[in-house]
From Swiss-Prot:
Subunit relationships: Homodimer.
InterPro entries, alphabetized: Cytosol_ACT, HOTDOG_ACOT, HotDog_dom_sf, Thioestr_dom
One Pfam family in the UniProt entry: 4HBT
Keyword Transmembrane helix appears in the UniProt entry: no
Gene assigned in the entry: ACOT7L
Source species: Homo sapiens
Protein name: Putative cytosolic acyl coenzyme A thioester hydrolase-like
Assigned EC number: 3.1.2.2
Tissue specificity comment: Expressed in all tissues examined. Up-regulated in nasopharyngeal carcinoma (at protein level).
Pathology linked to this chain's protein: A functional variant in the transcriptional regulatory region of in ACOT7L cosegregates with disease phenotype in family affected by nasopharyngeal carcinoma. The variant creates an AP1-binding site that significantly enhances binding of AP1 to the promoter, resulting in up-regulation.
């Protein structure tokens, strides 16, 4: 729901009265906080706001609240910052220019520009990990990184894709969270919940018919939490000329 709310407001903003029609594609999810659980029977309220635009991207801040329909009580359950890029409807490989947003104060633009530069640097710093491959280890020792490693393989079908036959970002995020959950449960031997996601980078699009390999490994543990790195690789089985590539990565 958070991803869809951001996509709606971003697509509305990047389609002016005159010009090429485009759709907003999710490029990065900043640190996502899971503050409170949402219970069965509660109503979810999702609100999205555009807080900054650069030449080719837009920053959206999304809050999710839960409402108890019996008592009327509301509480903030999730909040996240997302970055979208406008892709042309006629050529999805073409990134269009983003219309500017009107700020109430000059400080808002300056703060947004700082956040933009920060996330851009972070994306560049994580690019060196794009060559990493999580290799399985035979008979690993318990309570080691190799022992907790987990992977899932998924064939991308039509129900996973958009109108342009590319995978929905939310589908990839769901499977990444499942891999992290399996890995954490294997290490801790108990049920766990996701507390936060540091950042998800969507580096490349995944087409219908590709095989996704989602791999996870532990990078740090404390007394009450674990940090997990999840990587998504894609193999295009219908096009043998295209090599395996890194599609997304996250620390959770």
């Amino acid at each position: 729901m958070i991803k869809e709310a951001g996509a709606i407001i971003s697509t509305r903003h990047c389609n002016p009265q005159n010009g090429d029609r485009c759709v907003a594609a999710l490029a990065r999810v900043e640190c996502t906080h899971f503050l409170w659980p949402m219970c069965i029977g509660e109503v979810a309220h999702v609100s999205a706001e555009i807080t900054y635009t650069s030449k080719h991207s837009v920053e959206v801040q999304v809050n999710m609240m839960s409402e108890n329909i019996l008592t009327g009580a509301k509480k903030l359950t999730n909040k996240a910052t997302l970055w979208y890029a406008p892709l042309s409807l006629t050529n999805v490989d073409k990134v269009l220019e983003e219309p500017p947003v009107v700020y109430f104060r000059q400080e808002q633009e300056e703060e947004g520009q700082k956040r933009y530069k920060t996330q851009k640097l972070e994306r560049m710093e994580t690019n060196w990990r794009n060559g990493d491959i999580v290799q399985p280890v035979l008979n690993p020792e318990p309570n080691t990184v190799s022992y907790s490693q987990s992977s899932l393989i998924h064939l991308v079908g039509p129900s996973d894709c958009t109108l342009h036959s590319f995978v929905h970002e939310g589908v990839t995020m769901k499977v990444m969270d499942e891999v992290a959950g399996i890995l954490a449960a294997r290490h801790c031997k108990t049920n766990l919940v996701t507390a936060s996601m540091e950042a998800i980078n969507f580096d490349n699009k995944i087409r219908k018919g590709c095989i996704k390999t989602i791999s996870g490994r532990m990078t740090f543990t404390s007394n009450k939490s674990v940090e997990i790195e999840v990587l998504v690789d894609a193999d295009c089985v219908v096009d043998s000329s295209q090599k395996r590539y890194r599609a997304a990565s996250v620390f959770t």
